[in-house]
Regions:
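Conserved N-terminal segment of class I S-adenosyl-L-methionine
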Residues: 1-163, 167-171, 180-184, 248-264
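Phosphate-binding active sites in nucleotide-utilizing proteins
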Residues: 176
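A short glycine-rich, Lys/Arg-flanked "PGG" loop and its adjoining helix->strand segment in the class I
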Residues: 181-196
Length: 264
């Protein structure tokens, strides 16, 4: 672990309780995964700050490291990858899913990458922390009437007016966010009444995690700083002004949860 990459130990991002139980089985290389003694939420106690997360622990880097690790674990993981190749079809179907969820109007993609996820006729807007990806996304989105903001999620949301968006997409975002409640409150502010937030993120409560233990693909150090169960996500949604629906509740082995939150 790079000591420069750490900040003061975090309290629970779900309930702000200080006391937490160490989970050494799920900790690695000095990165300490803990369970809150107040609400049971699992999170990384010593999370890196944004600047170092971008420079030293970017998604592209940690993903590559994880891919090498899975290969080194041998035939078992290769078999798992082959058995779950259906996941590539889910990626192809994402555009149709978002069109069905949002219908039309202005939709914000938080962590938009290159800006090509949201299908027509949606008017795409984005927030992206990577300078290179933001530059690409901004060009793509401006051609369709939107634009992209270069900023972390919470700061990027501040650039938009209240009740501006018909929908918001956050795919693989909340597991990286040190203050997930603040991010959700920001989304709530920019959504119109009745607007929808579609979430996808690792499901710490899934069957695969219980079977795979520390080798579960949802563990990534140190850029995954929150580990949500469905119950954690539902509670946080209610506390920040949303109703909650677990979209893929009949897929207990799925590594990710899909959820639809609606602004009251």
């Amino acid at each position: 672990m790079n000591d420069r990459a750490t900040v003061a130990e975090r309290d629970c991002p779900a309930c702000e309780t200080r006391a937490a139980t160490e989970l050494p089985r799920f900790s690695r290389d000095g990165w300490r995964v803990v369970a809150c003694e107040g609400c049971g939420f699992v999170y990384l106690r010593n999370a890196p700050d944004y600047a170092l997360l971008v420079e030293e622990f970017a998604w592209e880097k940690t993903y590559a490291i994880e891919k090498v690790r899975r290969r080194s674990d041998g035939a078992f993981f290769r078999a798992v990858d082959r058995a779950t190749s259906w996941r590539t079809k889910l990626k192809r179907d994402a555009g149709a899913r978002y069109r069905k969820v949002f219908g039309s109007g202005r939709v914000l993609d938080v962590g938009c990458g290159g800006g090509e996820v949201l299908p027509e006729p949606l008017i795409p807007f984005g927030i992206e922390i990577s300078a290179g990806l933001h530059a690409i996304a901004d060009v793509v989105m401006r051609k369709r009437g939107g634009h992209a903001v270069h900023a972390p999620g919470i700061e990027g949301l501040k650039t938009f007016e209240d009740d501006f968006f018909d929908g918001v997409l956050m795919s693989s975002i909340l597991e990286h966010e040190k203050d997930p409640k603040a991010l959700l409150r920001g989304v709530h502010r920019v959504l119109k009444p009745g607007g929808k937030l579609y979430l996808k993120q690792p499901n710490y409560g899934c069957t695969n995690r219980k079977v795979m233990g520390p080798k579960w693909c949802g563990f990534r150090y140190p850029d995954h700083v929150n580990y949500f169960r469905v119950s954690d996500m539902a509670r946080m949604a209610r506390e920040t002004g949303f109703s909650f629906r677990h979209v893929n509740r009949f897929a207990p082995c799925a590594d990710n949860m899909h959820a639809l939150l609606t602004k009251a």
